[in-house]
């Protein structure tokens, strides 16, 4: 058994002539979603595949064996349900609605511009037909979406690992210290002719003028 522990997504970076000379191995989706499996390539060699946990193998990927040989993966045809919109009783939007309901059920879906593909399920097939969609069982390769956060998954045939994103380091730039807050000076309160609230603040009172009158005696 030849051990395989490396996968090159879509053979990125390899010379086309090397990929063309590589042996092939046909795998259905049930096997390709596993990180550990045995398979037999086109040369009759038994492969023991041990990939990082969570890795999804796609058709077009290239496996690298411990002896340096390469094996191109072919997604083998398998029974799937092909779902299309019914132009007579529905609209293309029905596919979007179907993808939403299938996603809520965590059903693996292959998304195409004009159709969807899922693994056979008679209950889901009846539900989709009730939504005015056309459902046919066919034999085709199945490449469902891997999920935005799946480890090692590359559902669109390119290697996201080659992109470099520089992280924004908040620890390396200095922020000027904030200026101390200055207490706002209250504005003078002005009462206009339309002011309707009462004057509850004190006004300075002027001192009262006291007048003293002397009383004349009655016998005068």
Curated annotation (Swiss-Prot):
Checking Gene3D superfamilies in the record gives:
Urease metallochaperone UreE, N-terminal domain, UreE, C-terminal domain
Determine the domain of life of the protein's source.
Bacteria
What are the protein's UniProt keywords?
Chaperone, Cytoplasm, Nickel, Nickel insertion
Instruction: Return the annotated region ranges for Disordered.
Output: 145-220
Q: Where is the composition biased (Low complexity)?
A: 178-188
- GO cellular component terms attached to this protein's record: cytoplasm
What is the protein's known function? Involved in urease metallocenter assembly. Binds nickel. Probably functions as a nickel donor during metallocenter assembly.
Q: Family membership, please give it.
A: Belongs to the UreE family.
What name does the UniProt record give this protein? Urease accessory protein UreE
| Taxonomic source organism | Polaromonas sp. (strain JS666 / ATCC BAA-500)
User: Species lineage, top-down?
Assistant: Bacteria, Pseudomonadati, Pseudomonadota, Betaproteobacteria, Burkholderiales
